[in-house]
């Protein structure tokens, strides 16, 4: 965990320090309805297989900012991104994590070892499924997120896993690399501040957490050559 001041001053304003953010609902409109009906028509064989996270992905946008044909099939989805999300974030790789009924997305870390210690905030929205089955692993006890039907920001650098305990697919929108907002990103921090003011009762922080014993084994295998960077890092 990072023991940092809870508040600080930036741009002449008292700010909350989000370096320990694990989960925060975001004060933006939810995406348009109707996506689930279309996603249900897509066969698993036509999705991207993610062996590391043990799930399938429906592509929404490439890293270069090009919307997929699937994204364009959902009425209003492209416009929602352009009007509500990219005004404070940026076009980046977006996918729909698809977890089958009874499925389990393996515990993982959504960044490379050389990015540990930086903000690894990820944007998410659950179109269908039990929101509380996103689970963050720590040394003392695992913690589930709240059941709030809102987009949210989560910490991709903290070990986490996901279950689907329903009899339908779970669909989770993800926005990730190369978007990597930091504490000097004024537009992004303003969204966090506004969201915290509205949803602070649901905010989850890692301030008093400890990483699980096996956390260094949870990175993607392709990053094994970077693990030496963490030899003296214990999350404190």
Language-model features and meaning:
Residues 1-89:
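Non-heme Fe(II)/2-oxoglutarate
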Residues 54, 94-96, 109, 194-195, ...:
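Positively charged, low-complexity intrinsically disordered regions
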Residues 82-153:
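Catalytic core of non-heme Fe(II) oxygenases with the double-stranded beta-helix
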Residues 27, 41, 99, 128, ...:
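Structured loops at beta-to-helix junctions and adjacent beta-edge loops in soluble globular domains
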Residues 30-32, 102-103, 113, 131, ...:
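Residues that cap or initiate secondary-structure elements
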Residues 135-235:
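Catalytic core of Fe(II)/2-oxoglutarate
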Residues 21, 120, 168-170:
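A general secondary-structure signal for short beta-strands and their flanking turns/coil
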